[in-house]
């Protein structure tokens, strides 16, 4: 039976929700053991993150890799360490997020192993399904015998695992030469009190129909009323209404909330590819022929400038 190493994503204080979904994928492998590797520096909240990982169902051990060079999650610095620690494992998995997509291919290269991206279904220990062509086709990938399996997991395809009695936390170290050509400069992030877009259970997104960046206050007001994250279509981002970290879709962020509200979004194929795993989709658009209504569970043909304020007022 396989041994799986899951790479935890965190911000130094809190474990990213995607890690719990990667564990669900790892569990589908029927593994003998599933260990979670947490990289960071001592005194930066690393112990808290390790505790959060240890409490997730299915975790056998949490491996704490603390060193000063891990103060920032630089893929070039983390990859050699992970490749060394992964020596005794059959599978190395991480989330298919910006972090995971940057890190895991490097790990695969160092291990001379195939890299499988966007795993959405486990068919067997070495066989997986992944989406292609904006999710319109599913590709079956088989990893040859004799090599490790290194992959990123499409977190939108899995539900987070539950909790368990805490697993043991063990300190580990890597015998790896670290590169010096990459250095951390600074982290800039916009201040926001809303949930993370990719892990939120509710998302409200606006499209080009919103008309302007100023009008996006309507999207933010509705999102805040619902306790939801705020997103946008590519058209709204390209028009400069909002920053590109809000983009939902094939070329943006793939989301799988329980509730997705699309306001003024026509429903381009690349946007629909990013919300295909959403639970309930609600669409508000004045164009009754908009493609978004073909996938919506609830559709409201109305002027968003009248409908959204009315919804905000009606919500408790």
Task: Map each language-model feature to its residues.
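N-terminal glycine-rich FAD/FM-binding segment characteristic of electron-transfer flavoproteins
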Residues: 1-316
């Amino acid at each position: 039976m396989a041994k799986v190493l899951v790479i935890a994503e965190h911000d130094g204080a809190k474990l990213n929700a995607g890690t719990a979904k990667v564990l669900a994928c790892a569990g589908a492998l029927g593994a003998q053991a599933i260990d979670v590797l947490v990289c960071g520096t001592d005194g930066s909240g690393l112990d808290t993150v390790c505790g959060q990982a240890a409490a997730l169902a299915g975790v056998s051990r949490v491996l704490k890799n603390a060193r000063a060079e891990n103060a920032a999650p630089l893929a070039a610095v983390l990859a050699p360490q992970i490749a060394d620690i992964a020596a005794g494992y059959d599978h190395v998995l991480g989330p298919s997020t910006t972090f995971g997509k940057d890190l895991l291919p490097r790990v695969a290269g160092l291990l001379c192993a195939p890299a499988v991206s966007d795993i959405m279904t486990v068919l067997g220990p070495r066989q997986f399904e992944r989406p292609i062509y904006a999710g319109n086709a599913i590709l079956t990938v088989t990893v040859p015998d004799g090599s490790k399996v290194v992959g990123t997991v499409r977190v939108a395809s899995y539900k987070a695992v539950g909790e368990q009695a805490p697993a043991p936390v063990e300190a580990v170290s890597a015998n790896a030469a670290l590169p010096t050509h990459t250095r951390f400069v600074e982290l800039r992030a916009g201040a926001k009190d809303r949930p993370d877009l990719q892990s939120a259970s509710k998302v409200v997104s606006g499209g080009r129909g919103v008309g302007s960046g100023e009008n996006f206050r309507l999207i933010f007001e509705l999102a805040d009323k619902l306790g939801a994250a705020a997103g946008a279509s590519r058209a709204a981002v390209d028009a400069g209404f909002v920053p590109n970290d809000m983009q939902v879709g094939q070329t943006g962020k793939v989301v799988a909330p329980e509730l997705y509200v699309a306001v003024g979004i026509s429903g381009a194929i690349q946007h629909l590819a990013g919300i295909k795993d959403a639970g309930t989709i609600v669409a508000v658009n004045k164009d009754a022929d908009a493609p978004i209504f073909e996938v919506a569970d609830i559709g409201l043909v109305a002027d968003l400038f009248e409908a959204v304020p009315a919804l905000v007022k009606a919500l408790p």
